[in-house]
C-alpha cells in the first residue's frame, strides 16, 4: 500500500467542495477509505484547517470541530504529532516560505509523498504531488 501525507489544502477542498480541485480530493479520499493508500497528516495540518475554516470561511467552531473529527475518523489515517523544529527552521532559513509549511515538510516521513496544491513545497526536500497526479 502506497503512503501519502495530506496537506491542509487537500482536506479543505474535500470539506468545502468549493472549487474544481474538490473533485480530485474527494476521489483521492474515497480511494484512501477503500484501502488503496495509507495516509498521514499532522496536528499542524489540522490546526491550519481549523484556522482557515474559522477565519477565512467564518464557519462556526462547532462545525469546524465536526469537520476535524471526521478527518480523524478517516480509514488508514495516522496522525503525526512529532515535529523536528530544528529541521523546519533550517528549511525556513533556506527558502523563506511559511514556517508552518516548513514544519509540515519536516513531518513528512521519508519516501512518503506529500499531497498538496501548494507549490512552495517544491522548494523543499520532499516529494510533492497533487491529487490529480496520483489518480
Tell me the role of every PLM-derived stretch.
Residues 26-29, 68, 104-105, 118:
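Short amphipathic alpha-helical segments and helix-helix/interface helices
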Residues 10, 45, 84, 103-104, ...:
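Alpha-helix capping/helix-boundary segments
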Residues 1-41, 56-63, 133-135:
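Short, well-structured N-terminal submotif of metal-dependent ribonuclease cores
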Residues 76-113, 117:
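Active-site neighborhoods of divalent-metal-dependent phosphate/nucleic-acid chemistry enzymes
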Residues 20-24, 40-44, 59, 63-66, ...:
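Alpha-helix N-cap and coil->helix boundary residues
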Residues 1-3, 74, 105-106, 110-135:
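Acidic, PIN/NYN-like endoribonuclease modules and their adjacent C-terminal/linker elements
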Residues 26, 48-76:
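Active-site-proximal, substrate-binding regions of enzyme catalytic domains
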Residues 13-15, 52, 124:
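Residues that scaffold the ATP/ADP-binding catalytic core of kinase and kinase-like folds
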Amino acid at each position: 500500500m502506497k503512503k501519502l501525507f495530506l496537506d491542509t489544502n487537500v482536506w479543505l477542498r474535500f470539506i468545502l467542495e468549493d472549487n474544481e480541485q474538490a473533485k480530485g480530493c474527494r476521489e483521492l479520499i474515497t480511494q484512501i477509505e477503500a484501502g488503496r493508500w495509507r495516509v498521514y497528516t499532522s496536528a499542524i495540518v489540522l490546526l491550519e484547517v481549523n484556522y482557515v475554516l474559522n477565519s477565512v470561511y467564518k464557519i462556526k467552531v462547532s462545525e469546524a470541530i465536526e469537520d476535524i473529527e471526521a478527518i480523524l475518523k478517516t480509514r488508514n489515517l495516522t496522525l503525526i504529532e512529532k515535529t523536528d523544529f530544528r529541521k523546519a527552521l533550517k528549511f525556513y532559513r533556506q527558502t523563506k516560505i511559511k514556517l508552518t509549511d516548513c514544519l509540515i515538510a519536516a513531518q513528512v516521513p521519508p519516501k512518503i509523498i506529500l499531497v498538496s496544491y501548494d507549490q512552495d513545497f517544491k522548494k523543499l526536500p520532499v516529494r510533492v504531488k497533487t491529487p490529480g497526479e496520483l489518480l
